């Protein structure tokens, strides 16, 4: 598998020598050493676990330069050069590869090529040797980290602990901060919001992890993770809403309104600054933050309103949620008051903070980055938003229907608010409990599970409509197989952000609702190190030009990444497909006639007792038990690999035999073959240290799985009563043909030669839609039905 490396910054030999001297890797007297002496010293310096020169020299005999000679013996002959093969053998062993198991000592260069390592060359001078080691320290090891990070995990940089300054190497920050003495504290930011109605501004607990060096003169930037889950998660999955019910006439919709909560203006910060008096007991919940904490970036967490030990109530996706999370940044930049404890007597300041703030986090934590960024708050320099919701309607609804996130049937805004209302665990907080119960009733009514229609309630939770307020640089990360936060969330915010005068990048991986910072195929953590050094330390290191604007992981070969200028329909050419009465999906023949299927609702699914995931696979694979409740149209086999890009669109002329109806459409890759695993395989658990005796991550990657018959590419759903307007329902008569036109979730998917594309038209999606208790007939007029794709 290829260890692709995008974060290495091209560096001159002169600059490389300067950086090696600065970290005490290259000895000051290097010019007086012979080639062989220098080779021994530099190799030994990689072995950070050996703390004396004698111990380092003793270990040289453990390394082979070829299949006959160890490094110590090789050095006895005082060589003045080393061949590419010999150096590759030493380098591969330093990188963690095992000779005779991972590669052959007689052919190490093939191993380097296999893993996409930098090319090894004959080294005939000390200058070449020095630069070769510089490049080696910046090369990804078998554990996925660059060799310098492996050395850090063994204690190499403890020699710099206590110096109280950032050190950079190849444009990235080094772990020179004492992780054994991290300051862990809690403060209480006062909000302008009074969401619990007690007449006082809500107090928001904020947990800070920062380098001990920031106690003195050093000011450090902050990585802020807005996490509603930080105070704890209330498990309420057993009380999720019932989805086994018939559809409701959507014309009963009343357009529920958003109603703002009262404000209580917080006092301006005074000159008082008392050190924090509460120790943090919560743990960091995001690996990238821990990695960068060892490199000098403070890590800040807050769940804001409704979180454990704080005030207020959770109001999922609301402007109040955005305001409360933004207020934490205002404290970090000196513009908002915070207290040492809940008595509100003593103010405490973030004097340790440089005023530069970046944001990190996935899912809800990524969502709040989008929300806060739209406010344009001072001090927020960049966001790295992973698997984020950009409109809450697109999370819990779609085209006039109640639609669940994957594996979350019955969840909704009110249930998620309860999950995150961790101050309910503070038994004495009766104020919050009473306000929470009232808010739950309001959320239940306003979210309108009866009709699923767009409303003012949902409009207030659409961050994309405020995208023009974004002033910070932007990185979005999303899984192309994420059916929790569906891909159109990132696609639609990307269409906005890419037009703004801010630097922006997009990463799309093959995962579901997942992180990508520890994949084999990309050095994402190193890229983020480079990025945050540029954005928060304000060091010009070429980060903006270092990698392509859009990077997309291939669905056939996990270690292949596509560089694109954008992610949009116009990456491809439009192709129109028509379904025909004999079950073909054709580019040359128009469909005629009508076909009918009978939807069984959730009755058969409930009887089967299988999971929603198992149902979906059996359904898309064409198992008769489930396929009979659908219409399936298959293309001819593709002669050449074909990549689908952007958002497919369908037009379906359909009639139902009832006055309500829901239509689902799926695109499926057919053909029995190996496909990538749904989630990455862990190669080694806990093998990526963030620093010395600190936290760690696990190397992982998608790998070929056992053969399957089919794979879902994309899908979408629509309420038949929205045939005239996506934002307003219309009356539907039984037997009335209506023309539905809607887009599917966006994709970037390569169909290999020999694959078939299958269009499935159905109604009940057991994992996402409501599951009616009665059957319903749907008749599709093929003359008014078509599929528009964009193909590369």
UniProtKB/Swiss-Prot annotation:
Superkingdom per UniProt: Bacteria
Catalytic activity: Hydrolyzes Xaa-Pro-|- bonds to release unblocked, N-terminal dipeptides from substrates including Ala-Pro-|-p-nitroanilide and (sequentially) Tyr-Pro-|-Phe-Pro-|-Gly-Pro-|-Ile
Localization terms from the record: Cytoplasm
Active site: residue positions: 363, 482, 513
Keyword terms, alphabetized: Aminopeptidase, Cytoplasm, Hydrolase, Protease, Serine protease
Transmembrane segments: none
BP terms from Gene Ontology: proteolysis
GO CC, alphabetical: cytoplasm
EC number from the UniProt entry: 3.4.14.11
A Pfam family it matches: Peptidase_S15
Main localization, broad class: cytoplasm
Broadest EC class assigned to this enzyme: hydrolase
Gene Ontology terms, MF aspect: aminopeptidase activity; dipeptidyl-peptidase activity; serine-type peptidase activity
Entry function: Removes N-terminal dipeptides sequentially from polypeptides having unsubstituted N-termini provided that the penultimate residue is proline.
Family under the similarity heading: Belongs to the peptidase S15 family.
Oligomeric and partner information: Homodimer.
Name under which the protein is recorded: Xaa-Pro dipeptidyl-peptidase
Source organism: Lactobacillus delbrueckii subsp. bulgaricus (strain ATCC 11842 / DSM 20081 / BCRC 10696 / JCM 1002 / NBRC 13953 / NCIMB 11778 / NCTC 12712 / WDCM 00102 / Lb 14)
Gene from which this protein is expressed: pepX
């Amino acid at each position: 598998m290829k260890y692709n490396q995008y974060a290495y910054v091209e560096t001159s030999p002169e600059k490389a020598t300067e950086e090696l001297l600065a970290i005490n890797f290259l000895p000051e007297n290097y010019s007086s050493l012979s080639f062989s002496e220098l080779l021994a010293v530099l190799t030994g310096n990689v072995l950070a676990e050996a703390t004396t020169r004698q111990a380092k020299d003793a270990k040289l005999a453990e390394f082979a330069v070829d299949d006959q000679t160890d490094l110590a013996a090789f050095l006895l002959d005082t060589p003045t050069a080393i061949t590419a093969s010999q150096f590759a053998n030493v380098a591969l062993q330093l990188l963690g590869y095992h000779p005779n198991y991972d590669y052959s000592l007689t052919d190490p260069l093939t191993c380097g090529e296999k893993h996409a390592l930098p090319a090894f060359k004959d080294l005939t001078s000390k200058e070449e040797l020095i630069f070769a080691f510089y490049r080696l320290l910046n090369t990804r090891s078998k554990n996925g980290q660059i060799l310098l990070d492996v050395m850090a995990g063994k204690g190499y940089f403890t020699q710099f602990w206590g110096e109280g300054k950032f050190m950079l190497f190849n444009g990235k920050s080094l772990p020179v901060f004492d992780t054994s003495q991290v300051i862990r504290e809690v403060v209480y930011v006062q909000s302008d919001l009074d969401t619990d109605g007690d007449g006082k501004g809500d107090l928001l607990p904020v947990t800070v992890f920062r380098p001990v060096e920031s106690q003195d003169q050093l000011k450090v930037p902050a990585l802020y993770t807005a996490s509603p889950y930080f105070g704890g998660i209330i498990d309420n999955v057993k009380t999720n809403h019932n989805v086994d019910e018939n559809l409701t006439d959507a014309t009963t919709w009343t357009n529920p309104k958003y109603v703002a909560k009262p404000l209580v203006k917080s006092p301006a910060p005074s000159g008082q600054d008392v050190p924090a008096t509460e120790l943090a007991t919560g743990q960091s919940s995001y690996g990238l933050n821990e990695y960068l904490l060892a490199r000098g970036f403070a890590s800040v967490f807050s769940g804001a309103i409704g979180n454990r030990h704080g005030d207020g109530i959770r109001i999922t996706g609301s402007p109040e949620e955005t305001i409360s999370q933004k207020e934490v940044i205002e404290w970090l930049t000196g513009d908002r008051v915070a207290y040492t404890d809940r008595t509100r007597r003593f103010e405490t300041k973030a004097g340790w903070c440089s005023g530069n703030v970046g944001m990190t986090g996935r899912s809800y934590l990524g969502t709040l980055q989008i929300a806060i960024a739209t406010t344009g708050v001072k001090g927020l320099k960049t966001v790295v938003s992973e698997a984020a919701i950009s409109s809450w309607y697109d999370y819990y609804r779609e085209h006039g229907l109640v639609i669940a996130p994957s594996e979350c049937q019955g969840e909704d805004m009110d249930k998620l608010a309860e999950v995150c209302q961790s101050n309910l665990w503070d038994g004495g907080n009766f104020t919050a409990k009473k306000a929470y119960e009232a808010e739950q009733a309001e959320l239940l009514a306003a979210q309108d599970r009866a009709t699923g229609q767009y409303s003012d309630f949902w409009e207030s939770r659409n961050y994309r409509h405020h995208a023009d307020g974004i002033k910070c640089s932007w990185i979005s990360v999303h899984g192309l197989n994420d059916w929790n936060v569906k891909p159109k969330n990132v696609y639609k915010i990307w269409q906005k952000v890419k037009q703004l005068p801010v630097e922006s990048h997009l990463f799309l991986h093959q995962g579901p609702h997942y992180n990508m910072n520890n994949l084999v195929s990309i050095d994402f953590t190193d890229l983020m190190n480079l990025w945050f050094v540029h954005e928060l330390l304000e060091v010009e290191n070429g980060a903006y030009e270092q990698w392509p604007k859009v990077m997309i992981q291939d669905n056939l070969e996990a270690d292949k990444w596509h560089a694109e200028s954008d992610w949009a329909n116009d990456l491809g050419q439009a192709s129109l497909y028509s379904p025909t009465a004999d079950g073909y999906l054709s580019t040359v023949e128009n469909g005629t006639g009508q076909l009918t299927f009978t939807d069984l609702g959730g009755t058969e699914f409930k009887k089967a007792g299988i999971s929603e995931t198992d149902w979906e696979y059996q359904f898309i694979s064409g198992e008769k038990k489930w396929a009979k409740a659908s219409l399936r149209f298959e293309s001819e086999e593709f002669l050449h690999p074909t990549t689908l890009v952007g958002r497919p669109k369908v037009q379906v002329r359909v009639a139902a035999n009832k006055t309500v109806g829901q239509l689902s459409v799926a695109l499926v890759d057919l053909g029995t073959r190996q496909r990538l695993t749904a989630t990455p395989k862990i190669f080694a658990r806990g093998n990526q240290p963030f620093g010395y005796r600190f936290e760690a991550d696990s190397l992982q990657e998608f790998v070929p799985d056992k053969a399957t018959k089919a794979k879902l590419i994309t899908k979408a759903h629509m309420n038949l009563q929205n045939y005239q307007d996506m934002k307003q329902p219309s009356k539907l008569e039984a037997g009335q043909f209506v023309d539905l036109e809607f887009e599917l979730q966006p994709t970037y998917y390569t169909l290999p030669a020999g694959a078939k594309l299958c269009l499935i038209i159905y109604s009940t999606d057991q994992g996402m839609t409501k599951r009616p208790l009665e059957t319903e007939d749907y008749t599709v007029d093929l003359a008014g039905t078509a599929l528009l794709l964009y193909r590369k």
